[in-house]
Amino acid sequence: MTLPALVTWSCYFLTGSFPQPETLLAILQTNVSEAAGYLSGHLSLPLLLCLPLYFGALFLISGKSSTGELFSRPSLLPRLALLLVAPVSLALSYSNPVTTPWIGIKDYMKAYADFEQKSKERTIRLTNLTISSAPGLYVLAIGESENSEHMNVYGYPRPTTPWLSSRRNDPHFLFFDDAYSCYVQTVPALSYALTAKNQYNGMSLSDAPSLIEAAKAAGFHTVWISNQVRFSAWDTPTTIIASEADEQHWRNSHLGTTADLDVYDDALAEELTRMKSSEKTLVILHYMGSHMPYAYHHPKSYEKIHSDDPYRDQYDDTILFHDYVMEKLYETLSARPDFQTLLYFSDHGEAIDLHLDHNPTIYVPEMTYIPLYMVFSDTYLSAHPKLIGNLVTRQKSRWTNDLVFDTQLALMGIRLPDLYEPENDITSDHYDDTPDRFKTLFGTRAITAK
């Protein structure tokens, strides 16, 4: 219990709240460099006092002196009493704030294992699909920790998105103003976004087909291109889904040991220039984006924003660089004759103005504020006037990113009759955009409007 207790209490002194299982999962999946970057911006006096007090207590209840000899009887008895009381107290208080989140991790581990084991069963469910898609290249791009309220294209006063802002009135681009994340950490959010599971259906994650599985069943060639680390402490649904792709290109070789990059995010577009055309292709790009530590993930030439809040400035620099990344991606895609659609969203936001990042334990609405926009080729626009018309009228409709699965399949012309939910398909005539029905934190919190 020593290390788990230390982690739990450290989280408490960092945030003022005990962690949830999802927070501990994120900690276990982090690396030394990322953790150091986080702590450098969040050190506090309680945390600094926590560590020496904790280890001092461990020393006092240890059974031996520094010379290896047993302490005298008067000192030994209280130590033995503490050693006996501690495990008994934990056993009698199974649901205490120190042990409960660690017990919750076991449930997540089982859910992840079940998801991996049931892949074949899910594929069998995909034999009854209908396909109306035209040949071509369909792209899904996933941002990281990007808060739409820090993007000039959505009204933020700083010039963080000069390229996207210049495209706001381009008929090939549609920007959606009321998009939110279903969770405020990457793995949980993408576990829903990239599968048929969402907050509004009763499906279990293990039974939910993934976007890659559905695309392959429809005859698409699938490609996963990522600048995030490939492995963490264990496989998650995101890494399992990625491993199902016909092609995988991992541009970050550090394998969970560092937050450094081999290349910046703009290099991912190079993979598309080398990719041969096929009849139908789905490409999923997973960027490092605005992941902490912010200064690590863009060239120094993009350190352009300066004020009396360097933490906020560094974050806005990542938004500015990512605007260039998406400009380069668009130039690459528009040069390809097979390009059809691009859908971009972020996994979650960041409560950057409050210096709270994205922690469900200390949830604030800004952690859910994300961008959503789509780009279409001339060919696609002319071939799908009804679908485009629906999207145009929905640019101010509410949407959560656990509906990516429904949205992307609709853009690709893939229909799963046994799983289709028209009320969750923003391209559908029957999309339900009633604001009050939308939730976050896996259905436990109502959405707070931007």
Predicted segments, located by residue:
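Transmembrane and membrane-interface helices of multi-pass
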Residues: M1-I103
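Active-site-proximal alpha/beta segments of enzymes that process anionic O-linked groups
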Residues: L92-L140, S145-E303, K396, T400-D402, ...
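Short, P/G- and charge-enriched loop/turn segments at secondary-structure junctions
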Residues: L126-L129, D357-I362, V392-T393
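Metal-dependent active-site segment of extracytoplasmic phospho-/sulfohydrolases and closely related
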Residues: V139, F321-P360, F405-L409
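Histidine-centered active-site microenvironments of extracellular/periplasmic hydrolases
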Residues: P159, D338-F339, F345-P385, P422, ...
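A short beta-strand-to-alpha-helix junction
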Residues: C182, G202-P209, D308-L320, I362-T368, ...
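Active-site-proximal cap/lid insertion segments
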Residues: F231-T236, M288-R336, T361-I370, D378, ...
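C-terminal, low-complexity/hydrophilic appendages and adjacent surface loops
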Residues: T444-K450
